[in-house]
């Protein structure tokens, strides 16, 4: 058995629930919402002190791979020497990992046990 509607449907369509309200012209009005994305987690590249790697080699590595001038490289090298470790720079995760690998490879080729790592900035 088929049932028929007793009254004809209204001619003005009603917007579905949750849809933006329509203005007089029948067009849909959308609101632009600005979305904020979180900045990427940053990582610091840390060089560790050892008793065998020459200070001059550490300075050269800081200049070559981290773009430090002679004075800044010397200051970081002294911090590494005196405190046991020092921050070479702060980068995104991929860049920090690349820098760590560059330092390790250069140290290995030169026959030095210099260690370098990256850790999240807190």
Curated annotation (Swiss-Prot):
Pfam families: ClpS. One of its GO terms (biological process) is proteolysis. Residues 1-27 are annotated as: Disordered. InterPro entries: ClpS, ClpS_core, Ribosomal_bL12_C/ClpS-like. Residues 10-19 have a biased composition (Pro residues). It comes from the Bacteria. SUPFAM superfamilies: ClpS-like. Belongs to the ClpS family. Involved in the modulation of the specificity of the ClpAP-mediated ATP-dependent protein degradation. Binds to the N-terminal domain of the chaperone ClpA. This is ATP-dependent Clp protease adapter protein ClpS.
């Amino acid at each position: 058995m088929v049932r028929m509607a007793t009254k004809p449907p209204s001619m003005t369509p009603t917007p579905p629930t949750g849809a933006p309200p329509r203005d007089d012209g029948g067009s849909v009005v959308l609101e632009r919402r600005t979305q904020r994305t979180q900045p990427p987690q940053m990582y610091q590249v840390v060089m560790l002190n050892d008793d065998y790697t020459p200070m001059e080699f550490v300075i050269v590595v800081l200049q070559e791979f981290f773009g430090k001038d002679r004075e800044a490289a010397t200051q970081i090298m002294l911090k590494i020497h005196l405190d046991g470790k020092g921050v070479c720079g702060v980068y995104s995760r991929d860049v920090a990992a690349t820098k760590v690998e560059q330092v390790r490879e250069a140290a290995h080729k030169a026959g030095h046990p210099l260690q370098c790592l990256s850790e999240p900035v807190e």
